[in-house]
Structure formats: C-alpha cells, structure tokens
C-alpha cells in the first residue's frame, strides 16, 4: 500500500467568497475532512503537492496521511470537484478511517497477460475489458492499490467474472455479498467482428440505379 502524506492548514475563512479568493490566489486547494467521532474540519492543501498526488492512480485507493498543523489524520479520498471548463480542482473531500473498521472503496483493475492471451494469440479473438474497477470492502490496513486480472489462459468465448479474481487476505468484493446474480463479467474474449462480404454485396444487388428492387 502506497503511503501518501499531505500537509494541510485549518481553513477559517469559509463561504463562496472565500473559496473564490482562494482560487484566484491559485496556491491552495479547499478541502474538508469528515467522518468518525470528530466534527467536519475545513482545510486547505498546498496546490502543487495535491495536484502531483492526484496524478498517481494509487492515490485514489490508498490511506492518506494528512498532517494538519502537527496533528495526523488518516483518511481516504471520497470526492474531487473540478471546475467545469478550467483544469482546476475546486474542492476535495476526505473521509477519516478507523483501523478497526472496514471501509468500502473502488480500486482499479490491472489486466496482465494481454499479449500472451490464449484467445487472442492462438484463436484470433478480441479481448474486451468489461470493468475498469471494482468495489471492495476491507480494513484500512488491508486496502490494495489495485487488483490484478491475469488473462493469459483466457480462451475464445470465455469470460472472467468477479468470483474469478484472486483477492488479498481480508479483502472481499461488495457485489458478491448481494448474491450470485451480481457475479458480473470483468473481461472476455470474443470472435473478431470482421463483417460479411455477402451482406455488403446483397445490399448492392438489392436495388437498381432508380432505387427499385432488382429481381
């Protein structure tokens, strides 16, 4: 599990006007920490450090340490609000985590073995990724950055489902807790859709130059 640390300051100046001033200064990002037994805490984050952190995919599936004026807060990112047309983050939401309580979180899927995939390499199929991430439940200390999906032995016409994913100890898939009918496909190999020449030729023969049906 990656360890991310961000420095933050308590945000005393609140409201829309304060948020606009903060954006105009272009040095800080407004955010809030909530959850647990503590009250919600508005904060500001140093912009360049935060922007660098969110470039890393693992940031969104990791426990993050926020150093709030000398006090440590263990959190996960819950939401990022972006400007509608500028490349700016306008606000971020962080949720406190308790080491003894499970959390639910979406983690990305990393597909391995694409080039060696049996259904693609030997059977001329096409690999289809049906899900880019999955929702898991675990203790904060067990949170994986991602889950691996090995497609090396996946053959033509076959599908890997949620139940086929290897999970780290202490990690479960939220969807499967709702029953077998939620065992969705994650990746599959199907026959390449090359089209049929007959269909195209038939379309040309179906009408004459005047648009009337040919015999």
From Swiss-Prot:
The gene is rplY. Signal peptide: none annotated. InterPro entries: Rbsml_bL25/Gln-tRNA_synth_N, Ribosomal_bL25/Gln-tRNA_synth, Ribosomal_bL25_b-dom, Ribosomal_bL25_C, Ribosomal_bL25_long, Ribosomal_L25_dom, Ribosomal_uL5_bac-type. Part of the 50S ribosomal subunit; part of the 5S rRNA/L5/L18/L25 subcomplex. Contacts the 5S rRNA. Binds to the 5S rRNA independently of L5 and L18. This is one of the proteins that binds to the 5S RNA in the ribosome where it forms part of the central protuberance. Keywords: Ribonucleoprotein, Ribosomal protein, RNA-binding, rRNA-binding. SUPFAM superfamilies: Ribosomal protein L25-like (SSF50715). One of its GO terms (cellular component) is cytosolic large ribosomal subunit. It holds the Pfam family Ribosomal_L25p. GO terms for molecular function: 5S rRNA binding; structural constituent of ribosome. The keyword RNA-binding applies. Belongs to the bacterial ribosomal protein bL25 family. CTC subfamily. This is Large ribosomal subunit protein bL25. Residues 196-215 have a biased composition (Acidic residues). HAMAP family: Ribosomal_bL25_CTC. The keyword Thylakoid does not apply. One of its GO terms (biological process) is translation. Transmembrane segments: none annotated. It comes from the Bacteria. Residues 191-215 are annotated as: Disordered.
């Amino acid at each position: 599990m990656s360890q991310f640390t961000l420095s933050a300051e308590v945000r005393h100046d609140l409201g829309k006007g304060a948020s606009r001033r903060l954006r105009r200064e272009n040095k800080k990002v407004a955010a809030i920490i909530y959850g647990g037994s503590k009250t919600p805490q508005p904060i500001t984050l140093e912009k360049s450090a935060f922007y660098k952190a969110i470039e890393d995919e693992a940031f969104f599936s990791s426990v993050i340490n926020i150093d709030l004026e000398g006090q440590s807060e263990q959190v996960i990112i819950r939401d990022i609000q972006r400007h509608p047309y500028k490349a700016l983050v306008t606000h971020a939401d962080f949720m406190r985590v308790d080491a003894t309580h499970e959390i639910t979180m979406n983690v990305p899927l990393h597909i391995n073995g694409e080039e060696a995939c049996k259904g693609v390499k030997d059977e001329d199929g096409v690999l289809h990724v049906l899900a880019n991430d999955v929702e898991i439940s675990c203790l904060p200390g067990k949170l994986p950055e991602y889950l691996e999906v090995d497609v090396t032995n996946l053959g033509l016409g076959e599908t890997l489902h949620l139940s086929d994913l290897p999970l780290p100890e202490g990690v479960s898939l939220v969807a499967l807790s709702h029953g077998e009918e939620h065992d969705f496909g994650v990746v599959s190999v199907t026959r390449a859709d090359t089209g049929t020449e007959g269909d195209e030729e038939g379309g040309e023969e179906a009408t004459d130059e005047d648009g009337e049906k040919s015999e």
